[in-house]
Amino acid sequence: FLDYYSCGSVKGTQYLQILKSITEACKKINCALIGGETAEMPSLYVGNHFDLAGFLVALKEKTKKHTIKKGDLIIGIKSNGFHSNGYSLIRKIINDNKIKPDRSFIGKEKLSSFLMRPTELYHRHLSTKDITQIKSMAHITGGGLIANFKRTLPSKTKFDLVINKLPKEYEFIKKYTKMTNDEISEVFNCGFGFTIVVDKKASQQFLKRKNFKLIGSIK
């Protein structure tokens, strides 16, 4: 992993806190932080403003999506929030409706705290042994659940993807936007930040795990 951090000044604790967080995240996924770039641009960045980018290089197995067939199952691994996607819309909802960030959101958790949840790292949910049983994997990022999942399938592959009930955070989105479930799935992860496609015979070893759920099948 390599990082790029640019700011007005590296003085103070902000830069060190960010670097520490990157290091901790890399350790969680057994990834080496091998270098990066830091730039001070006081004429461009004011106060604590900064830009942060990261780049990860990895080896992957040869794709197995050509083995996907009718009857294979689609399993979703639950997300822990919005996962950094759809935040332009969320900010608009907050600003247009003058919603206070410190209001209660889900249970006793404040809205600001929920929105700042780090994206789940799915490395810990799957082992290298699992890869032999998985035909397709999708990290659900920008573009929502449907578009990201479709990218991992052979062209013209048909499937059924069913989310019976959206997590509570999407009631907030629907209340202020009147978006339908289909429209929400074009922007957000709908409660599942990662999907895998497996043969029906191999599905039980995944479905018995915490946060894994059957959400569809290949047609």
Task: Go through each PLM region and give its residues.
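Glycine-/charge-enriched secondary-structure boundary and capping motifs
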Residues: 13-32, 44-50, 100-116, 120-219
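Glycine-rich anion-binding loops of enzyme active sites
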Residues: 1-88, 217
